[in-house]
Amino acid sequence: MNIEKVIAREVLDSRGNPTVEAEVHLDSGFVGRAIVPSGASTGTHEALELRDGGSRYMGKGVQQAVRNVEEALGPAIVGLDASEQIAIDAALMAVDGTPNKGKMGGNAILAVSLATSRAAAEELGVPLYRYLGGSNAKTLPVPMMNLINGGAHADNSVDFQEFMVMPIGAPTFREALRYGTETFHSLKKVLSSRGYNTNVGDEGGFAPDLKSNEEALQVLLEAIEKAGYEPGKDIAIALDPAVTELYKDGHYDLESEGRTLSTAEMVDFWADWADRYPIVSIEDGLAEDDWDGWQALTTKIGDRVQLVGDDLFVTNPERLQRGIDTGVGNAILVKVNQIGSLTESMDAIELAKRHHYGTIISHRSGESEDSFIADLAVATNAGQIKTGSASRSDRIAKYNQLLRIEHALGDRAVYLGRKALR
């Protein structure tokens, strides 16, 4: 199962921006391929995404990252056994030699890392989720379906980035997807009836110019009920306000509402919403380095609401360990391109599970047809996945792959519903 050659190319993501695709060819003739995603709202502690700059593709080209794969990263792993993922990733990171993968680019390293695992699974003739997770990989994730987009993901007046539904009362993943999809179609009718546009944002959710952030919750609840479901029982609400994007000079600027909140006021804001609405999960409710604020929020509502660190933890075991040690948050969002290798992503998931933190496998706003994260969610029995709305083929690709996996597992498939929540 030795690696014979590694090639890369520049392809486009769902926003029409260049990204890296890598192919790992084995001496047996099997090939693994992977396309890396890209985020719009990125944490400052993420692995570096290498872009070319200049005028080509408005500076977003990745030709240098592609060259790094073919001229440096690929040659470093040629001849190695593709099934030795830890050794492969260590070799890739040794070529880079920087803490944030700033020399080769996290996008270059990750493309090769993921493609290697796919190549190994192909040669062994096993599904990717089984290769990564073994015989106990059987838990289908509860989808966090992003139905209303705001913030950096949409050109509208909504400050907060994602308003999601979670079908926690569904018996299976297949039914959960139906619950969420029916709510998506119901929401379109609700928005139209209120005179709002039904254009969609980067992740396939609607991006209406609502009168306030709270109106997003109100239209979601109406859509859930009109779809025939009970809010809080069949379908709950999850939020990703991504407030690092709103944090300026030590305060949180809710521009659309003309309000500026202190950390203490932001904590009270979320506690109030959690009291009045069926909100079961809040991601990045405070800024990525507002550790004191995070601690206060966790103390206040962490016993009843899943508090997810995305920009806070950036899929980094070291930052997660700090959160564990200081009682900050109770769940981690896992984005493979934040840390830049499969091994480090798996390490973060293992650390979270060891300390009873929830795990949510996530896409990025710039995605592709690559469905790797669907297999990763099942492989790690993560229990939850964020991969957008019920529209745009780059999002649907992940849902369809999960449907295939559930079908293949048959009676062995597990859907945890509410039990998946931290």
From Swiss-Prot:
Task: Tell me which residues bind (2R)-2-phosphoglycerate.
Answer: 161, 335, 364-365, 386
NCBIfam families according to UniProt: eno
Its EC number is: 4.2.1.11
Localisation per UniProt entry: Cytoplasm; Secreted; Cell surface
Instruction: Sum up the protein's function in the record's words.
Output: Catalyzes the reversible conversion of 2-phosphoglycerate (2-PG) into phosphoenolpyruvate (PEP). It is essential for the degradation of carbohydrates via glycolysis.
The keyword Flavoprotein appears for this protein: no
Q: Which UniProt keywords apply?
A: Cytoplasm, Glycolysis, Lyase, Magnesium, Metal-binding, Secreted
- Predominant location of this chain? cytoplasm
What PROSITE patterns has UniProt attached to this entry?
Answer: ENOLASE (PS00164)
Q: Which residues bind Mg(2+)?
A: 240, 283, 310
Q: State the InterPro entries in the record.
A: Enolase, Enolase-like_C_sf, Enolase-like_N, Enolase_C, Enolase_CS, Enolase_N
Q: What GO molecular-function term can you cite, just one?
A: magnesium ion binding
GO terms for biological process, alphabetical: glycolytic process
Family assignment from sequence similarity: Belongs to the enolase family.
| Keyword tRNA-binding part of the UniProt annotation | no
Annotated protein name in UniProt: Enolase
The UniProt entry annotates the active site at 203, 335
What catalytic activity is recorded? (2R)-2-phosphoglycerate = phosphoenolpyruvate + H2O
Co-factor note (free text):
Binds a second Mg(2+) ion via substrate during catalysis.
Cofactor(s) for this UniProt protein: Mg(2+)
Q: What class of enzyme is it?
A: lyase
* The organism of origin for this protein: Deinococcus deserti (strain DSM 17065 / CIP 109153 / LMG 22923 / VCD115)
